[in-house]
């Protein structure tokens, strides 16, 4: 699909296929003053209206009004762009309202992408997807973090269009058969070896609260005082949302 910025700042989406012979109209991101097919030269304005047909006399059957690029339903939320090839899809607002309600305090629209990272995983996509919808696998797959992650204490919420899993950090796994001190948990969370010095935990604080306080101050330089709006769970816990098919943990 093509997502095209309009002169008024809005967005439109079109199938990335020429209406003449189906060739891909654009092969990469960029800037352009028109949408021109590299095969035979058919061209459209950025608003989707037909602009040019080379040797137009050979196409008397084409009516300009009926040869615009078909628009795909498009909506935006918090800086994200959503499209749906189904012209009869459900309205966007009720589709996103459950997820949007979870992020009312986060002002996602003011954020920017600092880095884009991609990795190809040699597995069925559903396996990778499901692995991030639970923490049950931590005991066997990531045993090194059991001292600081309450894997089987996860809370899983399922709504109509989205789901959430919250796995508490700064607390040991219930599967461990031994007790941990706050210092043990802090070492595990900060990856500090036993022989190395550890910052003392302030009186009246446990390891979880201390880690949240340190993390909050570490984020302050980039995020500003908004970090004071976030509770310890939002700072320390693993909170993963799935909005099918748009967002994945």
Regions found by a protein language model. Name each.
Residues 1-105:
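Rieske [2Fe-2S] iron-sulfur-binding domain
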